[in-house]
């Protein structure tokens, strides 16, 4: 099939084929290989890395799906990883939920998923569980992604908005608000 069909979200054979041929292959890791409805994470590893858990979720519903420097998939990984990292945690695990519009080209989904896998792998993050739903044509705008991420916060780090004081120095890796401005620039 060249396009997403309602059957890809029905829990049947088409959905299993999509999961196995795309998601399992791209996001391959031991947690996904268990093929359970949840990821079973090793608490000892997280405890060894810190004394608190940073946990965040975000949804991505942008248009266009592809833009200079990235796409909705890369944005989903980077955005959620950043939300976890600003606490001082090292992002380790992500869940990923897709809402796909019937008729979405399979090549579009594959490009987004491949980008997500590459971005997560480069950051040392495992996508350990996920979900896929397909809605009727017109009920969504091509592709929506929800991610949730977690990582352990080292015991000696206590970052947060409430700890900021006048004179603190903030490090940023680019122009503030740049990604929002860039997305708007390409939709007008």
Enumerate the predicted regions with their spans.
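Helix-biased detector of long, well-ordered alpha-helical tracts
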Residues: 1-184, 188
């Amino acid at each position: 099939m060249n396009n997403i069909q309602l059957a890809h979200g029905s829990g049947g054979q088409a959905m299993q084929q999509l999961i196995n041929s795309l998601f399992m292959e791209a996001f391959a890791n031991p947690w996904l290989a268990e093929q359970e409805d949840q990821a079973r994470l090793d608490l000892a590893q997280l405890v060894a890395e810190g004394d608190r858990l940073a946990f965040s979720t975000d949804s991505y519903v942008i248009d266009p799906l592809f833009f200079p420097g990235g796409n909705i998939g890369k944005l989903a990984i980077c955005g959620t990883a950043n939300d976890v990292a600003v606490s001082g945690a090292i992002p380790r695990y992500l869940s990923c939920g897709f809402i796909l519009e019937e008729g979405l080209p399979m090549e579009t989904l594959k490009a987004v998923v491949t980008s997500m896998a590459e971005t997560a792998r480069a950051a040392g993050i495992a996508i350990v569980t996920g979900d896929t739903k397909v809605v009727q044509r017109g009920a969504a705008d091509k592709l929506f992604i929800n991610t949730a991420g977690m990582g352990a916060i080292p015991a000696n780090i206590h970052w947060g908005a409430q700890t900021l004081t006048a004179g603190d120095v903030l490090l940023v890796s680019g122009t503030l608000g740049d990604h929002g401005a860039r997305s708007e620039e390409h939709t007008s």
